[in-house]
Amino acid sequence: MVMALVLIKLGTGEYLSLAKSAKEEIAKIKGVAKVYAVFGRYDLVAQVEAPTLEELSRIITDKIRAIAGVVTTESLIVGF
């Protein structure tokens, strides 16, 4: 099992509604264990788990980055 913390930056605009809807959509993705709204450089942090590194990459690039409002992501792969 591979796990990563994905730091997510959202676009500007109706921030509160955008953050809430993006958080809800990300939480529905298979492999996403938890999603937190945070303050600071990033807006959301998602804990993502997958059986392989390739599957983890697919979830992040094909699913999370496709959510409306997501501008950038940075992934921190957990080593142990």
Predicted regions and their residues:
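A compositional/biophysical signature of low hydrophobicity enriched in polar/charged and small residues
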Residues: M1-F80
